[in-house]
Structure formats: structure tokens, C-alpha cells
């Protein structure tokens, strides 16, 4: 009898799954509300509606939100990190803040194999690019790579699941093999800011034989935490000859100080000349 049931369930395939979702509707993975049976993403419409673009003003280079009464009077508008020339990439943006909905959605894609989220995120990023296409001008789309051991363990690279459909939407070549991670990430779950920078230093390289010279690269990842990963990838790409690197992530982790005015904006007259990166 058990064999017959398994066989019947296999024959039913998607129909069986749809029937089960009607009889036993799944809860939203953020708020617990019961989902509509047609939803491929296990997050309700109300929670998805909270996934909103970061509000400006933003740092003109890295996209960090800047809360300051003087922001409108400063040009160019740079955060203290970009004023110091910390980042190697030319431009970066994140779609949303890494809040409750964004963090849960990213983790579901990353660890729970909710793969439709990759294309859903890609649509959001494509909309962000449409707001400023010149800043994202690129020849190729490249996902931030996982180390080979981590890729084998997880079975996929979440950045690739976002970058591939995004490249298709933009009509650009997708180059998943252009960058490789040559140093593994420590097993420690949470890293300090200093540890994040140290562990990615020299962790990426272009694949041997890859054609990178004079390329404009759109680099895609899931989360911008400190910017260390995008910076390390950008340095590897530039070393191989890339002329421009723009970074794009689904979400950005904002520091606790985000709730207070950013007192570290530097007036234009006090800014150094050159990129400093």
C-alpha cells in the first residue's frame, strides 16, 4: 500500500503539491500568516511589500544612506568610508535595508533552497538599475563566487541564482566562472568588522585564462555588510585589467548609528583629490 501511495504521489507531481497546499496552506516564513496556494515564495504579500528600496540621500559612491540636515548642501556627497578611499570599486548600490523581511528572504535563498527568490531579487535589482543605467553600464555580469568547498557543501551559489536572471533581463553576458574564491571563509558564524576585512584580503582571483582586460563588470552579491567582499573582488578584477567595477546587492546591513545623523560627512573643501582607493 505504501508503495502504491508513493507511486501515485509521484505521478501527481505538481498537482499533488498544489492539492496539498490547498488542504494544508503553508504559513508565511516572516509573520506566520497563511499563504495563498499560488505563491511560489513562502512570504506573504504584506511582508513582501515591506521590501522597499533604500531611501536617500545616499553616498554617491557606495550607496550608504546618509542622514544629515546638511546632505543636500554637500557635493559630491560621500560617506566617511568613501571619503577615506576605502573601497576599490567605482560604484555600488543595495536595493533594500537588511531588515527582518530582507534578512529572512536572503537566508531562505541561501540555506533553505527557496530558489524562486533568486529571480524575484533579480527583478528588484533590474528596477534599481533602470533608475540609474549609466552608473551600471557593464559588459558582463559576474556573481561573487563561493569557495569550491562551500559550493559543494551548499550545492549552489546564491549570488549566481540572482545574477544569472539579472544578466538575462539586462541582455548582458553572464560570466560565473570569471572570478574564483581561492581562500575559504572561516567556519566562525559571526565575524567582527576587522575579521571580515582580513579574511577576504587576497581571497579572490580571476580564473586562469579569463579575458578581463578593459571589461566593465557588474558584480552581484546578496548582502553588503562591510563592503569588504565587493572590495576584494574588485581588486582582483582590476588586477586582471578590468576598467570599471560596479557592485549591486540585494540588501545592505546598516550600522546602529544609521538612526542618528551622520556627523562624519566631510565638506567638499576638506576632501582629498583622487580616488584614494
Annotate each PLM feature.
Residues 38, 140, 170-180:
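A short coil-to-beta-strand element that immediately follows conserved catalytic motifs
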Residues 38-41, 151, 255:
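Glycine/Thr-rich phosphate-binding loops of Rossmann-like dinucleotide-binding domains
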Residues 39, 54, 136-137, 173-174, ...:
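Alpha-helix N-cap and coil->helix boundary residues
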Residues 2-9, 14-16, 25, 164, ...:
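PRPP/pyrophosphate-binding module of the type I phosphoribosyltransferase fold
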Residues 24-26, 142-144, 172:
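Hydrophobic alpha-helix-in-membranes signature
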Residues 1-51:
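N-terminal cysteine/histidine-rich coordination modules
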Residues 21, 140-141, 216:
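Hydrophobic alpha-helical transmembrane segments of integral membrane proteins
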Residues 49-169, 189, 193:
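Extended interfacial segments that mediate partner engagement and assembly in macromolecular machines
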Amino acid at each position: 500500500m505504501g508503495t502504491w501511495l508513493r507511486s501515485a504521489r509521484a505521478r501527481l507531481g505538481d498537482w499533488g503539491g498544489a492539492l496539498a497546499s490547498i488542504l494544508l496552506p503553508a504559513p508565511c516564513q516572516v509573520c506566520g500568516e497563511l499563504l495563498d496556494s499560488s505563491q511560489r515564495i513562502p512570504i506573504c504579500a504584506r511582508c513582501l511589500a515591506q521590501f522597499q528600496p533604500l531611501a536617500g540621500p545616499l553616498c554617491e559612491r557606495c550607496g550608504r544612506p546618509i542622514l544629515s540636515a546638511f546632505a543636500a548642501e554637500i557635493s559630491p556627497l560621500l560617506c566617511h568610508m568613501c571619503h577615506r578611499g576605502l573601497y576599490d570599486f567605482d560604484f555600488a548600490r543595495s536595493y533594500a535595508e537588511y531588515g527582518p523581511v530582507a534578512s529572512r528572504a536572503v537566508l531562505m535563498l541561501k540555506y533553505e533552497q527557496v530558489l524562486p527568490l533568486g529571480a524575484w531579487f533579480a527583478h528588484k535589482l533590474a528596477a534599481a538599475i533602470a533608475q540609474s543605467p549609466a552608473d551600471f553600464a557593464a559588459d558582463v555580469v559576474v556573481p561573487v563566487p563561493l569557495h569550491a568547498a562551500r559550493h559543494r557543501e551548499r550545492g549552489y551559489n546564491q549570488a549566481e541564482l540572482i545574477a544569472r536572471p539579472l544578466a538575462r533581463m539586462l541582455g548582458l553576458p553572464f560570466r560565473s566562472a570569471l572570478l574564483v574564491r581561492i581562500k575559504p571563509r572561516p567556519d566562525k558564524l559571526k565575524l567582527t568588522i576587522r575579521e571580515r576585512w582580513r579574511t577576504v584580503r587576497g581571497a579572490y582571483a580571476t580564473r586562469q585564462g579569463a579575458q578581463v582586460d578593459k571589461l566593465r563588470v557588474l558584480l552581484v552579491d546578496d548582502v553588503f555588510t562591510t563592503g569588504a567582499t565587493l572590495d576584494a573582488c574588485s581588486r582582483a578584477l582590476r588586477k586582471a585589467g578590468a576598467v570599471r567595477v560596479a557592485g549591486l546587492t540585494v540588501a545592505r546591513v546598516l550600522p546602529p548609528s544609521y538612526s542618528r545623523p551622520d556627523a562624519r560627512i566631510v565638506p567638499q573643501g576638506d576632501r582629498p583629490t583622487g580616488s584614494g582607493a
